[in-house]
A protein has these predicted regions:
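Alpha-helical transmembrane segments
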Residues: 331-335
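Polar-ligand-bearing catalytic/cofactor-coordination segments
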Residues: 2-322, 338-414
Length: 414
């Protein structure tokens, strides 16, 4: 161990302590408010539904707290515990050469990480979601999803890893810039291809066939100047009772998707209001802003890695004795979240700001009152807590807390 080892452990300890403290605040706040529905929701949400949401939030937070400790121990095991060094040495014995060995190392490491997360995924799906009446996933579907995800990782990940390691080896001291261009291109390609190629591997998508709703939606799209490949309904009920809607794709491949569970919950005017909110993200260019932000972050990260890769203390401080490009990449991907935790509340704040902007747009194109009714139904059906801890919410939540969001929309109903 060297000085950087202690810096890493200190940062990890501070990060873990902060997250555990926030989780404790969330648990205490939700439990303290479990016995009473907030006044703003007293007429629309019954105490039983409110208590279910509180219990669901508490259960998920408890599991999340356990995962925090588990993942921190795994990270120490992978790094200072010698896990990565051992796995790399195992692949080196085959004598395949630098790039093939690096690709095998990257792919196997990510597969092992996924397997180590499997117990939590199984427990969440088949115990927690089942207990609260949300789970519709069968063991066969769960296994099928895992197999598809693994196959996709191999089909997409192996060529990407090979190209990345080749650039790191062959393109000189500016390899990080070329790798960033590769990553940017790949990310944009995936964003474009996801709706039409990847998502249908996991869910069935059908065009909305309700003529009355189609007419209302098309009228809204025309008012907003939005052209898409269609309004789709996804068979979300095949896996879960949760409902949602989202905007996906880019260019000529833009789509708006409703979960079938959501369409069963909301009335036509409420669906129109939810769609107006999603269109607000499009009109306010939130997707483009997020893409640019992520691209700049990845550029800064790769530039930093371009310097770290030459520093022996970086490897030795994280339990690696034989430096290599693929180990530098793995170490950076695994450890950087520990040192960038301060960005989490900043990104959450920007995301909540975008949600407010989308709500404001929806209030001008549809009805704020309809959107409020839709949100209340979604909070109820998804068992979303109405009383999150303010600091926990500020740190993590991508959407404004329910009372704050509804209060904001209420100012737009006049």
């Amino acid at each position: 161990m060297n000085t950087f080892s202690w810096i890493f452990l200190l940062a990890l300890g501070v990060s873990l302590a902060l997250k555990l403290w926030l989780a404790r605040r969330q648990l205490q706040n939700v439990a303290a408010n479990r016995g009473r529905v907030p006044d703003a929701f007293a007429d629309s949400i019954q105490l039983e539904a409110h208590q279910k949401a509180a219990d669901y939030t508490i259960t998920n937070t408890l599991q999340g707290r356990l995962e925090l400790v588990y993942n921190s121990l795994l990270l120490v095991g992978w790094t200072l515990g010698g896990g990565l060094q051992w796995l790399d040495s195992s692949w080196q014995q085959f004598g395949w050469g630098t790039i093939p060995t690096g690709v095998a190392m990257l792919v196997s490491a990510f597969l092992i990480m996924a397997l180590l997360e499997l117990p939590f995924s199984l427990y969440h799906t088949f115990v927690i979601e089942e207990r609260f009446g949300f789970n519709k996933t069968t063991p066969a579907t769960f296994i099928g999803d895992m197999a598809k995800q693994a196959l996709l990782m191999l089909i997409l990940g192996v060529p990407l890893a090979w190209a990345a390691l080749w650039l790191m080896q062959e393109s000189g001291h500016l390899w990080w810039l070329y790798l960033w261009l590769l990553w940017a291109g790949f990310s944009l390609l995936m964003l474009w291809a996801y709706p039409a190629v990847i998502a249908p591997l996991f869910n069935k998508f059908t065009l909305l066939d309700d003529e009355n709703l189609q007419h209302r939606i098309q009228s809204l799209l025309d008012r907003c100047g939005f052209k898409s490949r269609g309004i789709y309904v996804m068979d979300g009920s095949r896996r879960s009772g949760h409902g949602n809607a989202y905007f996906t794709g880019m260019g000529q491949n833009k789509r708006i998707v409703f979960f079938d569970t959501l369409l069963k919950t909301l009335e036509a005017d409420e669906i129109e209001a939810v769609l107006a909110h999603e269109l607000g993200h499009f009109k306010r260019k939130h997707v483009q802003k997020r893409i640019v932000t992520m691209m700049l972050m990845s550029l800064a990260g790769l530039a930093l890695l371009g310097w770290l890769i030459e520093q022996n203390w970086f490897y030795q401080g994280l339990g690696v004795q034989q430096p290599s490009n693929h180990l530098a990449l793995l170490l950076f991907l695994m450890v950087s979240p520990v040192f960038t935790i301060f960005l989490q509340p900043l990104f959450s704040w920007f995301s909540r700001r975008h949600e407010f902007e989308a709500d404001d747009y929806a209030a001008t194109q549809a009805s704020a009152a309809d959107l409020i009714r839709a949100l209340v139904k979604m909070y109820k059906e998804n068992a979303s807590t109405l009383t999150p801890d303010p600091l926990y919410s500020a740190f993590y939540d991508s959407h404004p807390p329910a009372p704050v969001r509804v209060a904001h929309l209420s100012t737009k109903t006049g």
